[in-house]
């Protein structure tokens, strides 16, 4: 990783934002202002290489005006895995123009993207209300991650990107939200076999960043294969459970 997350934590601890005027103190409403603090601090470290995901794509296409259509624009990203993780899809890419640029989307893979020397540091920001015991947040689709691992293996892409998570822990004090602590973790340093897949929540991997162990010491090739083994095992178990619960009790009525 290129970003000095320890410096980012030092800078944002103690920062405050006004309590939202409406809505619950969770999710996007409370988290967005802290996300901007993190973005600002990372941009201080890499002023010319830090982007929002949509900003990076807009900048890339703006700099290559002769590339028209989805195929030509997708070819600007020389990594199938990175293209899969960052692309907005063929229709959106084909319809892009200077007058019709991309806007921020909540389901973008990266909240923040640091790109330097063809290395992509994908950063996702999570916020947590420390006053409440809440379910771990959605991190990334288990299926999307499986597809990414397959592309990594197919194309031998194990050293051109990483995926990091940054958690802001905050607490409500009077009329302000105060950042009490922050944590960071690298997805590819976690044990892939321990990642929890919530099949009922759109197949999302869920964890609190502060709880994600960082004990995996093998390379990304082994990580990708280990994760795919874990995903396939869990998917087969889920399929068996679905058949046992929702198919077998009713088969006798239709035979």
Where are the regions that the model predicts?
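Nucleic-acid endonuclease domains
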Residues: 1-109, 116, 121, 127-255
């Amino acid at each position: 990783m290129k970003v000095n997350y320890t410096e980012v934590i030092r800078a944002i601890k103690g920062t405050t934002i006004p309590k939202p005027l409406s809505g619950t103190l969770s999710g996007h409403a409370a988290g967005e202002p802290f996300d901007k603090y993190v973005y600002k601090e990372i941009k201080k470290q890499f002023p010319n290489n830090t982007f929002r995901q949509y900003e990076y794509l807009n900048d890339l296409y703006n700099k290559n005006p002769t590339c028209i259509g989805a195929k030509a624009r997708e070819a600007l990203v020389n990594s199938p895995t990175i293209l899969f993780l960052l692309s907005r899809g063929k229709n959106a890419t084909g319809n892009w123009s200077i007058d019709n640029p991309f806007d921020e989307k909540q389901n973008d893979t990266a909240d923040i993207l640091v790109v330097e020397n063809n290395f992509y540091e994908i950063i996702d920001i999570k916020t947590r209300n420390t006053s409440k015991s809440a379910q771990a947040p959605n991190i990334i689709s288990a299926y999307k991650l499986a597809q990414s691992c397959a592309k990594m293996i197919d194309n031998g892409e194990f050293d051109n990107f990483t995926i990091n998570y940054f958690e802001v822990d905050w607490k409500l004090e009077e009329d302000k939200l105060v950042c009490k602590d922050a944590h960071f973790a690298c997805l590819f340093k976690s044990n892939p076999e321990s990642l929890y897949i919530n099949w009922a929540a759109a197949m999302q991997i869920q964890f609190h960043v502060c709880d994600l162990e960082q004990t995996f010491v093998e390379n990304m090739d082994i990580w990708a294969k280990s994760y795919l083994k874990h995903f396939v095992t869990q998917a087969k178990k889920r399929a068996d459970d679905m058949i046992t619960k929702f198919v077998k009790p009713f088969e006798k009525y239709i035979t």
